[in-house]
Amino acid sequence: MLIIGIAGGTGSGKTTVVRKIIESLPAGEVVLLPQDSYYKDSSHVPVEERQNINFDHPDAFEWSLLSRHVAMLREGKSIEQPTYSYLTCTRQPETIHIAPREVIIIEGILALCDKKLRSMMDLKIFVDADPDERLIRVIQRDVVERGRTAEAVMERYTRILKP
């Protein structure tokens, strides 16, 4: 089994790299664990306050669950991967059944941040891109896929992502 970690800033092209890796391997041999699926549940936080959560900080993730799931897959056990809604900024009750495969890809902005998780990886990739190009990609993605306004994306970029 090969475990690959792919990290990089928001809009850097991580998803494109993941897609190219998956396309280059035989069908059915790869399982993708998006780090976003492991955001801590914030359903207890009032809706208006969820917009103030820094989802690009290591504290936003449930590292212990992600590490446990990777270990289980490595042991040949299936997992129930959490699901996350960008629209409500909460973990959803539904899970996705994931069976072990020959290649596990862990993808996310901070996928290489946690020491325990990083030690499980056989290959670590950091994707970098021009900041202006990243901003354009983030605006395009977040407006279409996540229901945000361009103004909200720009505000988040200047307040959280750029610094």
Each PLM stretch: what is its role?
Residues Q92-R146:
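ATP-dependent NMP and nucleoside kinases share a basic, alpha-helical "lid"
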Residues E23-V31:
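Post-Walker A helix-loop "phosphate-sensing" segment adjacent to the P-loop in P-loop NTPases
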Residues T10:
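The conserved Walker
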Residues V17-V18:
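Post-Walker A alpha-helix
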Residues V31-P34, K40-T88, V103:
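Conserved nucleotide-sensing/catalytic segment adjacent to the nucleotide-binding pocket
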Residues V144-P163:
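Small-molecule kinase domains that catalyze NTP-dependent phosphoryl transfer to phosphate-bearing small molecules
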Residues K14:
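Conserved lysine of the Walker
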